[in-house]
């Protein structure tokens, strides 16, 4: 959100790069965005070194240690450049020339104000609206931000309630008269959507089949949902009570209307991806090991910390710690351990 605000209001030339696009190098990632003479490496290097362009690199936590090292080396080499990088909490060594800023959790009043600000975007037929909705928000925050609970759990609650995506889900659920479970938000939202899916389409939500298709989609680095096969699913996910996906419409070269659906946030996609990792089948157990170093499935392991049976989660914790020791990459293991403690 901050980067979006920064880019929209900048008066300078800005290059936005997802960190995943920098696996070959930052200069190479910029070149891929340009055409003609502007692609010249020497020309680009002069622009960057002189501070003529700003560079935003987003999502360092979503890439391998090798890619992060390339980005850090670039930043240290162009120390006069205007470069901003973002990451979720991560154990790493920033470039020696970098200045670090930490986003602080929202205060209770700020969380309350955000929830109230969602009212105009809530479904028109929401069960709880107006003053009743405001009171529901107050009551809920008083309960979940109870200072009598363990500090670690309270810190985890504040982190979740400082995430606009999670807060929006909380607002939607409160407006429906539900009690959000902050540590299982996506699962809770899915259960509500699946129950309505069954009522509307007279059949169970095809969770296993849809999740397998999403896993394949992720492996192929595709973004659009396989809507040809799951049109009813896409329609239910897009319902304004859940807003789990968003759609984009356009006309093709023949003037025919086209429409595609995309997950509104990676956290929602991760919920469906994690279904492939759950259960006692050989396939599920194999994925737990095979995808451990795949940054595309980082969020899946965080969900596993809360969704796996406790003994299985503890076993996976040890495997992740061993993996981190072997690879010197603890981007997943540290957060997994913290999440597991909340249980």
Each model region followed by its residue ranges:
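Residues at alpha-helix boundaries and the short loops/turns that link adjacent helices
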Residues: 109, 164, 294-295, 307-311
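C-terminal leucine-rich, beta-strand-based interaction scaffolds used for sensing/assembly
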Residues: 219-300, 313, 317-342
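P-loop NTPase signaling cores
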Residues: 1-200, 204-205, 209-212, 226-240
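Generic structural signal for hydrophobic core residues of well-folded globular domains
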Residues: 6, 63, 78, 118, ...
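Post-HExxH zinc-binding segment in Zn-dependent metallohydrolases
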Residues: 36, 296-306
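Alpha-helix boundary/N-cap detector
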Residues: 128-136, 295, 311, 327
